[in-house]
Amino acid sequence: MKRLAKRLQDFNELVMFQHSVFSLPFIFIAMIVASNGWFGFKLLILGVLAAISARNAAMGFNRYVDRVYDKENPRTAGRPSVDGRLDGGSIAIFTVVNALVFMAVAYFINDLAFYLSLPVLMVLLSYSYFKRFSSMAHIVLGISLGLAPMAGAIAVLGNVPLWSLLLSIGVVFWVAGFDLLYSLQDMEFDKTNGLHSIPSRFGSDITLKISALFHVLTVGFWGGFVFAAELGLFAIAAVIFAALMLSYEHYLVRRDFTQIDRAFFTVNGYLGFVFIGLIILDKVSL
C-alpha cells in the first residue's frame, strides 16, 4: 500500500497536478454560461475527467521527451522523470492511458467532442517540441489551455459561440503571458542548450513588455466575452479583478525575479477561482 501511495505521489509530482487550477475554472466558466447556470452532474464528472486526463497526457508526454534537457537543468533535475523514480516506460504508459481516457470521455460527452478529441490531443502534445525550433512555444502553450473554454461550450451546446471564442483567446494570452514570466528562470539555460524562447532570444526587458501586452489583450478579450455573453455586474467585476491580479503579478516579477514562482502559481490560481466564483454569482443574481 505504501509503495502504491509513493507511486501515485511520484506521478502527481510528474504532472504537477496542482497546476490544474489554471485550466479547470475556465472550462466550467464556459459550461456555466452555456447552460445559463447548472449543467448537471454528468457533465461535471465528464468535464473533470476530460480536463485532467488531457492535461496528464500532455504533461506526461512533455516530461518524457524533455528528459534529456531536464536532467541538465538545475531547476528540473529533481523531477521524477529524471532522478530515477519513474522510468521512461512507465511515463509512456501513463501518457497513452490518459490519452485514451480523454478520448473515451469525449465519446460520452457528444459526437463533436469525440471527433475533435484526437486533433486536440495533437495540439496538446505538439507543445513539447516547439522549443526545439521556435520561440512561439509560449503561444502554443496558451492555445493548448485556451482550448478549454471552447471545449466547455461544446460539451453543453455542441457548438462554439462567439463568447466562448473570446473567452478562449483571453486564456491563450493569459497563459502565454505568465509562461513568458515563468520562462525567465530558464533564460540562460535555453541559450546554452539551443532551446528557443522569447526570453532567450530577446532578453528579460522585452519579455516583460511582451508579457504585459499579452495580459492587456487578456483583459480586453475577457471584457469582450462578458459583453458577447450578455453577463452582468459580477462578471464585469471578475474582469476587473483579473486586471488587478495581472498587474500585481507583473509588479512582483519586475521587483524581484525570485518572486516568479509566487506570481506564477499563487496569483494565477486565485485569479481563476475568483473569476469562476464571480461568474457563478452573476448567474445566481439574474
Where in this protein do the model-derived segments appear?
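Small-residue-rich segments of transmembrane alpha-helices in multi-pass membrane proteins
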Residues: 24-30, 141-156, 201-204, 265-279
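Alpha-helical membrane-protein architecture signal
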Residues: 4, 8, 25, 45, ...
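Extended hydrophobic alpha-helices typical of membrane-associated regions
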Residues: 4-6, 217-220, 224-286
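Cytosolic, membrane-interface loops and tails of multi-pass inner-membrane proteins
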Residues: 1-9, 59-86, 180-205, 251-258
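Membrane-embedded alpha-helical segments that form the functional core of polytopic membrane enzymes
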Residues: 25-65, 75, 99-107, 114-126, ...
